[in-house]
């Protein structure tokens, strides 16, 4: 590791082979927590390249659990986290709306790393078993159109890196690659990113991973979700072509909602918020969900514009289908 640390300290990029070799050492348990933390920090300070990110992603995916699903067009909408916004679980709430709108959702997520409540925490609070066997998870997805894939269960070797991540307590390359290491080969993806200037790099990685269509979104104040109070920046990957765009709440005639308006709490509080949104109870949480679910429908290609996606999300929630999708998962993803 000495050569690697010296190279990173000199602000030199690693080759895919070099970072793959480091990743294999990490995921075999051959490096100490101190070495892993030093590696993550050195990479963060230098700045990660698409090649470095791809090398890590490939190594992690190679060792991931296999989900034997018959679903070939699955989508994920998880974000990187790490934005310190302490908002409610937006992408988790949106996943039920997207699934109710006809998209097969394989939601990849974890426990809280830098927030009060991760997706796994809030779903457990709702009675959903996040540690089922891969075969059962595949059955749930095929039968209900939605499933939650717990990252720790999908990537058991990640246990070697988790203590270092928690000790650091700040976003690292592992936040960036979390949404990229989905165990299934996704067709489409909505990826929330806490740093807008990294969007193009991640779009390049998604392209190399074979995504047909994807949207990477960074909200105001570097949120890893779209928000209704400032400018949102996104990158669209569509059949190999990459383009950028931006929007504000005013573009869609939606109300202004501040970050303070959508603060979440612990898993119990966030579970209550999620249910209230899916029951179509008016609130800033509902409006924020409509925006992000609309963006998800657009990322999937289900609609031709974000505005059409917002309208579809509104219709799906008002019809009761989104809440029904939650009930379906609660009944299916159990012991």
Swiss-Prot record:
Mg(2+) 1 binds at residues 91, 225. It catalyses: N-(5-phospho-beta-D-ribosyl)anthranilate + diphosphate = 5-phospho-alpha-D-ribose 1-diphosphate + anthranilate. Anthranilate 1 binds at residues 79, 110. Pathway: Amino-acid biosynthesis; L-tryptophan biosynthesis; L-tryptophan from chorismate: step 2/5. Mg(2+) 2 binds at residues 224-225. GO terms for biological process: L-tryptophan biosynthetic process. GO terms for molecular function: anthranilate phosphoribosyltransferase activity; magnesium ion binding. Its EC number is 2.4.2.18. The keyword Amino-acid biosynthesis applies. It comes from the Bacteria. 5-phospho-alpha-D-ribose 1-diphosphate binds at residues 79, 82-83, 87, 89-92, 107-115, 119. It is an enzyme of class 2 (transferase). Anthranilate 2 binds at residue 165. Binds 2 magnesium ions per monomer. Keywords: Amino-acid biosynthesis, Aromatic amino acid biosynthesis, Glycosyltransferase, Magnesium, Metal-binding, Transferase, Tryptophan biosynthesis. GO terms for cellular component: cytosol. Its cofactor is Mg(2+). Homodimer. HAMAP family: TrpD. Belongs to the anthranilate phosphoribosyltransferase family. Catalyzes the transfer of the phosphoribosyl group of 5-phosphorylribose-1-pyrophosphate (PRPP) to anthranilate to yield N-(5'-phosphoribosyl)-anthranilate (PRA). This is Anthranilate phosphoribosyltransferase.
């Amino acid at each position: 590791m000495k050569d690697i640390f010296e190279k990173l300290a000199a602000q030199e990029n690693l080759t895919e082979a070099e970072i793959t070799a480091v990743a294999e050492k990490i995921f075999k348990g051959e490096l100490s927590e101190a070495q892993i933390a030093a590696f993550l920090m050195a990479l963060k300070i230098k700045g990660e390249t698409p090649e470095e990110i791809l090398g890590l992603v490939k190594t992690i995916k190679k060792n991931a659990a296999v989900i034997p699903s018959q679903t070939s067009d699955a989508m994920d909408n998880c974000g990187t986290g790490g934005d310190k916004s302490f908002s409610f679980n937006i992408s988790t709430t949106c996943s039920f709306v997207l699934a109710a709108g006809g998209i097969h959702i394989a939601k990849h997520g974890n426990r809280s790393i830098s927030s009060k409540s991760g997706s796994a925490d809030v779903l457990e609070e709702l009675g959903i078993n996040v540690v089922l066997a891969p075969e059962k998870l595949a059955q749930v997805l095929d039968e209900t159109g939605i499933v939650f894939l717990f990252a720790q269960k999908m990537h058991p070797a990640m246990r070697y890196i988790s203590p270092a991540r928690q000790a650091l307590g700040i976003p690292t390359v592992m936040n960036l690659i979390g949404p990229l290491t989905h165990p299934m080969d996704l067709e489409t993806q909505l990826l929330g990113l806490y740093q807008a200037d990294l969007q193009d790099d991640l779009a390049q990685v998604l392209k190399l991973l074979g995504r047909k269509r994807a949207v990477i979104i960074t909200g105001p104040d570097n949120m890893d979700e779209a928000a209704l109070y400032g400018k949102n920046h996104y990158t669209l990957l569509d059949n190999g072509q990459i383009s950028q765009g931006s929007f504000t709440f005013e573009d869609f005639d939606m109300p202004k909602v501040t970050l303070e308006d959508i603060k979440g709490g612990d898993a119990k509080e966030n579970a209550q918020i999620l249910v209230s949104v899916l029951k179509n109870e008016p609130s800033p949480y509902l409006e924020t969900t409509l925006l992000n679910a609309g963006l998800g429908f657009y990322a999937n290609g289900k609609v031709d514009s974000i505005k059409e996606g917002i309208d579809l999300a509104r219709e799906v929630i008002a019809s009761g289908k989104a809440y029904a999708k939650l009930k379906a998962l609660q009944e299916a993803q159990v012991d």
